[in-house]
Amino acid sequence: MRVAVDAMGGDNAPSVEVEGAVVAAREFGIPITLVGDTERLRQELGKHNVQGLDILLHHASEVVGMHDAASDAVRRKKDSSVRVAFELLKTGAADAVVSAGNSGATMAAGMFVLKRLKGIDRPAIAQIFPTLRGKTLVLDVGGNVDCKPIHLVQFAIMGEVYARHVMGVEQPRVGLLSNGEEDSKGNELTRETNSILKNISFDYIGYVEGRDIFNGVVDVVVCDGFVGNVVLKLSEGLAEAVGKMLKDEIKQSFLSKLGYLFSRKAFSNFKKKVDYAEYGGAPLLGINGVAMICHGGSNVKAIKNAIVFANDYVRKGVNQRLAEKLETEFTMYMQQGNVRESVAG
């Protein structure tokens, strides 16, 4: 079991990726291969005590930047760190990939090198959000900004299977994100998707609104990558702003500071619950392999947790189980009501 880390991807690469890998290897004994400019990686590793750690270096001469086209990872920069990481996975030299780089490029490289699971047209980035009652899975949160109804239907099926067999939800409630609960709301994309999902035999509860993501009434929320990414970034910004507002209010008076001392544990638990770094990264569902996509601004904690999650994902055989379930259940779902034909028509 070995995790390949795209050490050159992300806003703070390679220092954060290297340190995150070192922490994961030291605390959890996870074998890791850092992919990127080996000279720079050796310099970064020299800042840490790596004695006894199973950390390998694999050279990649190119980097796909955050502003590069996603296709660069496939066509122009064939020796990019993210593509090379997926090549290691394909050849068996690694069992999972972790990247905080360009999410579009990561998805493109994963699709090109590993191919898609049977029955999936487009993979989706799935993100877990904390809620009042547990957790909600939202997909897609950035992989596909332009979608057709068939893609959202596939996202719904992947999310439902993931929630059941990974998150442990016995009967996941699936909702389609819209601007209101009434069937008349939404746009052409959501209305067509809504009519199709009503004919599929899982617990589809119809349209849900943005607030429903956090109140715990739904387990899987489906949307296109444009909307999902806005939701993701808005949530991160709101959590950060609320934290700063609370800090400012606490500083206003002695009584506020005293109250904080008695409530410190509650504040700490709240901060931990809304901290994206606790979740590490988001699994890329729909490709024939395990890949975790991290926030571009990921810190050491986030990279470490993404590596740990990827390791656990592989160790439990989650992707194999997901592939098996998708192959049988996707075929069954898609045959109900001639879903694919109705969309194509």
Swiss-Prot record:
Short name of one Pfam family: FA_synthesis
Chain segments annotated as transmembrane: none
Enzyme Commission identifier(s): 2.3.1.274
Catalyzed chemical reaction(s): a fatty acyl-[ACP] + phosphate = an acyl phosphate + holo-[ACP]
Single biological process term from Gene Ontology: fatty acid biosynthetic process
UniProt GO cellular component terms: cytoplasm
Pathway where this protein functions: Lipid metabolism; phospholipid metabolism
An example Gene Ontology molecular-function term: phosphate:acyl-[acyl carrier protein] acyltransferase activity
Location in the cell: Cytoplasm
Main location: cytoplasm
Keywords per UniProt: Cytoplasm, Lipid biosynthesis, Lipid metabolism, Phospholipid biosynthesis, Phospholipid metabolism, Transferase
UniProt record similarity statement: Belongs to the PlsX family.
SUBUNIT field: Homodimer. Probably interacts with PlsY.
Role this protein plays: Catalyzes the reversible formation of acyl-phosphate (acyl-PO(4)) from acyl-[acyl-carrier-protein] (acyl-ACP). This enzyme utilizes acyl-ACP as fatty acyl donor, but not acyl-CoA.
NCBIfam families associated with the record: plsX (TIGR00182)
Entry protein name: Phosphate acyltransferase
